[in-house]
Amino acid sequence: MDRTWLLLTWLLLLCGVVQGNQESINQKYHDVCSGMYSKEDFNGKVDPYISFTLEELSLADEDDDGEGVSVAVFDFQDYEHIGVRLPNGEIQYICDDYALDLGLCEDSSEGQFIIQETAIDPFTSKEHKLTSQILTFTQQELGTNDKVYSINKTGYYCVTTSSFISSSSKFKATVNFRNAYGQLDASEAYKMPIYAFLAVAYAVCTLVYSWLCWKHRHELLPLQRYILVFCIFLTADTIFVWMYYIIENQKGNSSVALHVYMVFISIFSAGKMTFTLLLALLISLGYGIVYPKLDRTLLRRCQIFAIFTFAVCVAFLVQKYSQNSESLSNLILITAIPLVLCLFAFYYLTLSSMNKTMTYLREQNQVVKLNMYRKLIILCYISLFILFLGLLVSTFAYVGMDTVDMIEQYWKTEFLITDTWPSFVYFLVFVIFAFFWRPTSTSYLLACSHQLPTDMENVSEFDLDDINSLSDEALPNREPRNDYQEHDHNMDIDLASDFEEVPSVNANTNANNDVLFDVDYDRDAKNDRSTT
């Protein structure tokens, strides 16, 4: 087998880095790799090592007592040192009778992998020596081998196996990549402190937003209640993910309880994604900002579609986790295709609704609300730009590396590209979004703003009873002032008599005034007239 194909095989293995401390291998899938930290780089209670446990062995010929499994443990940088290239271009990996006849190995190494002290790099054609030791042995008996591979430096280590004497023999074994800090895979080690930080950050944001909601509980919009519930949900979801990595680090990934817990987290992850899409769709439709309430039929359709998307997402994640990663099956498409269609539908509906809402606000000259939606669009574009920027930077970081160096370094930053970076971007976007729609003493005026539509066709979209009820809820918490109530009463009369007339409530008309809706302007003017 050519070394180029061997390198490509390990490159594919890197794309599916072991998701835990232990990995199963057999006669069909006989290679496995994982990053390992030295005790100096990531301190812990034990010295890191790699061990091999043979669980099953089915001999092709029961009379052949010498048959077993050949094992080699090595640093990936030294993969060229395994095997010897023959004159015909093929590579002889195992020290068998043929290799002994050619003098490629000694009798004491029979059944083991052939190791070369010096090798030629296929990319640079330069000779180089071993950077780390290569452990090779044979095993015929079931159980854990006495020989373990000690990790003295941080690197990407691999275990390759082969059944010697007969290629038709079957076996099953477990490789234990034991790091100093615990059972968690090295590529996920930093997820524990990262998710701990995110859990604390979400908890702080939830406390702050809860305090604002309690402080302005009589002026809350329905949308702000949605955001509060979502804050609590995101905090719980992040804590559960953090606890998952802590449990896996302590117990390993082989327990049934951990797999059940993984399904539970999948449900939460599906809820997080679905709730995000639903919230974005409701805002794009103008819920709570442009209109105090949406049409009941339209709102029900959004909720039903969100529930359907949630069910499809849960089915996809459960199928993904329950399916054996070694068995490539197209059955995953049964749930993957509907999920992609649902996500595309959400994406299309959100953008089209956002465009219609902004067009409507522009036609009605509702400048304040239009600016809020513009900020939201800008925030979405910036978040996408940051996501792609992180991907671009990570890509260029590996441009100057050769294939071996890239494989050696990728596992250290893989979690940043696929998990941490999107999680941090999502957190920042959500915090900024929640800040835009935070509860204030005047935030309820966004829903009952007097900067109303000027066409009679849209009158039905604004329920004056909702406006009055919102105003009545807020007034008891303020000192009773007859002139304000008189002004509010006259305002309703003006709205009922002539809907096209814009009331005298100013929506940031003064360049030096930072107040969104100055509800005291007319009252002060009226008092000035009465004094004169």
Swiss-Prot record:
Name its GO BP terms in alphabetical order.
retrograde transport, endosome to Golgi
Q: Membrane topology for this entry?
A: Multi-pass membrane protein
Its primary localisation, in coarse terms, equals Golgi
- GO CC aspect terms: clathrin-coated vesicle; cytosol; Golgi apparatus; membrane
Keyword annotations of the record: Glycoprotein, Golgi apparatus, Membrane, Phosphoprotein, Signal, Transmembrane, Transmembrane helix
* Further details from the record: Present with 14600 molecules/cell in log phase SD medium.
Output this protein's name: Uncharacterized membrane protein YHL071W
State the species of origin.
Saccharomyces cerevisiae (strain ATCC 204508 / S288c) (Baker's yeast)
